[in-house]
Protein backbone atom coordinates (compact mmCIF):
# COMPACT_ATOMS: atom_id res chain seq x y z
CA UNK A 1 0.00 0.00 0.00
CA UNK A 2 1.44 3.35 -1.00
CA UNK A 3 0.62 6.60 0.67
CA UNK A 4 -0.03 9.61 -1.47
CA UNK A 5 2.38 12.45 -0.82
CA UNK A 6 0.76 15.86 -0.45
CA UNK A 7 1.62 18.52 -3.00
CA UNK A 8 4.63 20.53 -1.78
CA UNK A 9 2.66 23.78 -1.59
CA UNK A 10 -0.14 22.10 0.40
CA UNK A 11 2.42 20.66 2.83
CA UNK A 12 4.04 24.08 3.24
CA UNK A 13 0.67 25.65 4.02
CA UNK A 14 -0.10 22.87 6.48
CA UNK A 15 3.24 23.33 8.28
CA UNK A 16 2.80 27.11 8.41
CA UNK A 17 -0.78 27.02 9.67
CA UNK A 18 0.07 24.34 12.23
CA UNK A 19 2.99 26.41 13.50
CA UNK A 20 0.74 29.48 13.80
CA UNK A 21 -1.86 27.46 15.72
CA UNK A 22 0.87 26.36 18.14
CA UNK A 23 1.94 29.99 18.60
CA UNK A 24 -1.69 30.99 19.27
CA UNK A 25 -2.15 28.15 21.76
CA UNK A 26 1.09 28.99 23.56
CA UNK A 27 0.49 32.74 23.68
CA UNK A 28 -3.15 32.24 24.70
CA UNK A 29 -2.14 29.94 27.54
CA UNK A 30 0.48 32.48 28.66
CA UNK A 31 -2.17 35.22 28.61
CA UNK A 32 -4.36 32.97 30.80
CA UNK A 33 -1.48 32.32 33.20
CA UNK A 34 -0.57 35.99 33.53
CA UNK A 35 -4.18 37.06 34.05
CA UNK A 36 -5.03 34.25 36.51
CA UNK A 37 -1.95 33.20 38.48
CA UNK A 38 0.08 35.03 41.10
CA UNK A 39 3.84 35.16 40.56
CA UNK A 40 5.60 32.07 42.02
CA UNK A 41 2.46 30.83 43.84
CA UNK A 42 1.87 27.07 43.34
CA UNK A 43 -1.59 25.76 42.40
CA UNK A 44 -1.72 21.92 42.32
CA UNK A 45 -3.45 20.24 39.39
CA UNK A 46 -2.36 16.66 40.17
CA UNK A 47 -1.18 16.72 43.80
CA UNK A 48 2.49 17.73 43.80
CA UNK A 49 3.22 16.11 40.42
CA UNK A 50 1.81 18.81 38.16
CA UNK A 51 0.61 22.30 38.85
CA UNK A 52 0.53 25.94 37.85
CA UNK A 53 3.28 28.35 38.94
CA UNK A 54 3.86 31.60 37.07
CA UNK A 55 7.49 32.60 36.57
CA UNK A 56 9.37 34.76 34.08
CA UNK A 57 12.45 33.02 32.72
CA UNK A 58 15.22 35.24 31.33
CA UNK A 59 17.28 32.18 30.36
CA UNK A 60 16.91 28.95 28.45
CA UNK A 61 15.82 25.55 29.77
CA UNK A 62 16.18 25.25 33.55
CA UNK A 63 17.04 28.97 33.69
CA UNK A 64 20.46 28.43 32.11
CA UNK A 65 22.01 31.46 30.42
CA UNK A 66 19.87 33.97 32.27
CA UNK A 67 22.48 36.68 31.76
CA UNK A 68 22.67 36.09 28.00
CA UNK A 69 19.17 37.02 26.85
CA UNK A 70 20.36 38.78 23.68
CA UNK A 71 22.36 35.71 22.64
CA UNK A 72 19.34 33.49 23.28
CA UNK A 73 17.24 35.88 21.16
CA UNK A 74 19.72 35.59 18.28
CA UNK A 75 19.81 31.79 18.62
CA UNK A 76 16.00 31.72 18.53
CA UNK A 77 15.95 33.94 15.42
CA UNK A 78 18.48 31.72 13.63
CA UNK A 79 16.47 28.63 14.63
CA UNK A 80 13.26 30.13 13.23
CA UNK A 81 14.97 31.04 9.94
CA UNK A 82 16.52 27.57 9.64
CA UNK A 83 13.19 25.88 10.39
CA UNK A 84 11.40 28.03 7.79
CA UNK A 85 13.99 26.96 5.20
CA UNK A 86 13.52 23.30 6.17
CA UNK A 87 9.72 23.71 6.08
CA UNK A 88 9.89 25.17 2.57
CA UNK A 89 12.04 22.28 1.35
CA UNK A 90 10.40 19.29 3.01
CA UNK A 91 8.34 16.93 0.89
CA UNK A 92 7.30 14.35 3.49
CA UNK A 93 4.24 14.94 5.65
CA UNK A 94 5.65 12.76 8.45
CA UNK A 95 8.74 14.99 8.63
CA UNK A 96 6.58 18.11 8.30
CA UNK A 97 4.71 17.22 11.50
CA UNK A 98 7.90 17.51 13.53
CA UNK A 99 9.03 20.64 11.71
CA UNK A 100 5.67 22.32 12.41
CA UNK A 101 5.97 21.60 16.15
CA UNK A 102 9.53 22.91 16.32
CA UNK A 103 8.69 25.97 14.24
CA UNK A 104 5.64 26.89 16.31
CA UNK A 105 7.52 26.57 19.60
CA UNK A 106 10.53 28.49 18.29
CA UNK A 107 8.40 31.35 16.88
CA UNK A 108 6.51 31.68 20.16
CA UNK A 109 9.72 31.80 22.21
CA UNK A 110 11.23 34.33 19.80
CA UNK A 111 8.10 36.45 20.18
CA UNK A 112 8.52 36.40 23.96
CA UNK A 113 12.17 37.44 23.63
CA UNK A 114 11.34 40.29 21.27
CA UNK A 115 8.10 41.64 22.71
CA UNK A 116 7.92 40.97 26.45
CA UNK A 117 9.39 42.87 29.39
CA UNK A 118 11.99 43.96 30.24
CA UNK A 119 12.47 45.07 26.61
CA UNK A 120 13.10 44.28 22.96
CA UNK A 121 15.47 41.35 22.58
CA UNK A 122 15.66 40.90 26.34
CA UNK A 123 12.15 39.64 27.00
CA UNK A 124 11.56 36.88 29.50
CA UNK A 125 9.74 33.65 28.63
CA UNK A 126 6.46 33.13 30.48
CA UNK A 127 6.55 29.70 32.16
CA UNK A 128 3.67 28.34 34.21
CA UNK A 129 3.48 24.53 34.03
CA UNK A 130 5.28 23.17 37.11
CA UNK A 131 6.50 19.58 36.78
CA UNK A 132 6.80 18.33 40.38
CA UNK A 133 9.09 21.21 41.28
CA UNK A 134 11.82 19.99 38.90
CA UNK A 135 11.21 22.66 36.27
CA UNK A 136 8.55 25.04 35.02
CA UNK A 137 7.71 25.27 31.33
CA UNK A 138 5.01 26.28 28.88
CA UNK A 139 3.05 24.94 25.91
CA UNK A 140 5.80 25.89 23.42
CA UNK A 141 8.27 23.82 25.45
CA UNK A 142 5.95 20.81 25.20
CA UNK A 143 5.79 21.13 21.41
CA UNK A 144 9.56 21.65 21.12
CA UNK A 145 10.40 18.59 23.22
CA UNK A 146 7.77 16.27 21.74
CA UNK A 147 8.61 17.34 18.18
CA UNK A 148 12.33 16.75 18.75
CA UNK A 149 11.62 13.30 20.21
CA UNK A 150 9.23 12.55 17.33
CA UNK A 151 11.86 13.48 14.72
CA UNK A 152 14.51 11.33 16.43
CA UNK A 153 12.14 8.35 16.56
CA UNK A 154 11.12 8.99 12.95
CA UNK A 155 14.76 9.07 11.83
CA UNK A 156 15.46 5.78 13.62
CA UNK A 157 12.48 3.88 12.23
CA UNK A 158 11.92 5.52 8.84
CA UNK A 159 13.22 3.50 5.91
CA UNK A 160 13.97 6.50 3.72
CA UNK A 161 15.56 9.73 4.96
CA UNK A 162 13.44 12.88 4.76
CA UNK A 163 13.59 14.44 1.32
CA UNK A 164 14.48 18.10 1.20
CA UNK A 165 14.24 19.77 -2.19
CA UNK A 166 17.15 22.13 -2.90
CA UNK A 167 14.98 24.38 -5.08
CA UNK A 168 12.22 23.86 -7.56
CA UNK A 169 14.23 25.17 -10.51
CA UNK A 170 14.86 22.83 -13.44
CA UNK A 171 18.29 21.22 -13.55
CA UNK A 172 20.84 22.60 -16.02
CA UNK A 173 20.72 19.38 -18.05
CA UNK A 174 17.02 19.84 -18.89
CA UNK A 175 17.32 23.28 -20.46
How would you describe each model-predicted region?
Residues 1-175:
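Alpha-helical transmembrane bundles and membrane-interface segments of multipass inner-membrane proteins
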